């Protein structure tokens, strides 16, 4: 995770107390503080994803690019990871294949097929039975809750 501080260090500069605090804060945010002494290779797939996110957070990014950040995570950690990312207060561009999670945690969505944008907008506008048919070739029914959760039934 300390490698996330590398862009902020000059050649041969040692990490500062602030660097260590930022790394510890990042580990705390992703729930990996208790495992910080373990080798990366000994971690599960989900734990590795959380460590990678912690490394990115240690960089203090203004924009965070995430490719399937919830892949291999248990449901609890999927929800926690996306809630954390949403609460960071920075711009995030994420690729998610779980449409229901994307709707719940995204302010704006792009649905793509073959590299082309098929639908875009706030989740309620972009995710429709018609757009899911166009992108995934499935029939569906969508019910929206007041807190922007999409309940998708595939028919």
Where do the protein language model's features map onto the residues?
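Conserved ABC ATPase signature
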Residues: 13-14, 39-43, 47
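Conserved ABC ATPase "signature" region
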Residues: 17-35
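A short, proline-enriched helix->beta-strand linker immediately N-terminal to the Walker B motif
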Residues: 58-62
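Catalytic Walker B motif of ABC-type/P-loop ATPase nucleotide-binding domains
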Residues: 64-68, 73
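Short, glycine/charged-rich "phosphate-handling" switch motifs in NTP-dependent
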Residues: 108, 120
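ABC ATPase nucleotide-binding domains
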Residues: 129-155
